Amino acid sequence: YKTVFVPRLETCDVIITQGFTGHTKDGKTTTLGREGSDYSAGILAFCTNAEDVTIWKDVPGMLNADPKWFDDTIKLDQISFKEAIELSYYGASVIHPKTVKPLQNKNIPLYVKSFIQPNEPGTVIQASTEMDSLIPSFIFKMKQVLFSFTTKDFSFIVERNISDIFDLLHKHKMKVNLIQNSAISFSVCMDDDYNNFQNLLEDLKDKF
């Protein structure tokens, strides 16, 4: 970007470029996946030390819940980078969590606005804000499976047991969305889109 992009910025008022594309380690062209264009904007903003970034969506901004499942949702006028990453990581599809990280690194504000109502303020994502603690947010996730583990000898679920469980979850490439533990049990909630649950159970059956 230093040899191609930055020199153009010095001679042009506006640069139009594509997003969503990248390349593999061996140089082959590929795509960045869901919301890859937003991620591209975050990377370019980081590289050029942009004052701010605006992403245009078909929604008025980031909401505290999905309006498909919840009535009376509230638009979040401003939230912190941390809150935005949490919401997007666990299911809020307006932005991708990777979009936020390069902006957070240089404290570049991110505006999420509606192209249907372009004059509305939308949501600004920036450094820590008091609004995070005032409005609760809700994530609805479908197709979830719940696993509950108890040691065979009813011994306490301590750090060693939890570490063993997560080692196996990592081995089978399973992503945990929610955890809960008590004295003798440990539960995890995961997406129900893996084909190797039985293999996981086989690895766990000797101890749990």
Where do the language-model regions lie?
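C-terminal catalytic "cap/lid" subdomain
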Residues: 1-208
